[in-house]
Amino acid sequence: MTSELGIFYRSDFDRAWCDMSAETIKFTDSAAQRVSELLAEEGDQNLKLRVYVTGGGCSGFQYGFTFDEVVNEDDTVVEKNGVSVLVDPMSLQYLQGAEIDYTENVSGSQFVIRNPNATTTCGCGSSFSV
């Protein structure tokens, strides 16, 4: 079952949970393009980008990115331009309303999460608190 935003649901319970939260996760075109390029380099188009939140960093929580072949039963899957992003339920509560982007500028290039739930961030921007 798919919503108009490319979010896939495994059950009606998941749909109810995702309708209130996952549809507010934004995955930009530039992020999808960069992930697509990385997948081409890996040579495995079955990989998906997993975005997660874990404890750590100077502000209490930090973001993580990894490629994953396994879609867990309780994962939320967001698709954009043929790229799949996986978010586990624990991370989803911290990422509600967030935008996942990829930026390039004179300082370098990086994936950026703009998270409205983050009340403070560290100086380097790699950790946050809620």
Curated annotation (Swiss-Prot):
Record-listed iron-sulfur cluster binding positions: 58, 122, 124
GO biological process: one example: iron-sulfur cluster assembly
GO molecular function, one term: 2 iron, 2 sulfur cluster binding
One Pfam assignment: Fe-S_biosyn
Cofactor(s) for this UniProt protein: iron-sulfur cluster
Tree of life domain: Bacteria
Co-factor: note: Binds 1 iron-sulfur cluster per subunit.
Alphabetic keyword roster: Iron, Iron-sulfur, Metal-binding
Subunit text: Homodimer.
Family indicated by similarity: Belongs to the HesB/IscA family.
Function, in words: Required for insertion of 4Fe-4S clusters for at least IspG.
Name of the protein in question: Iron-sulfur cluster insertion protein ErpA 2
Species whose genome carries this gene: Methylococcus capsulatus (strain ATCC 33009 / NCIMB 11132 / Bath)
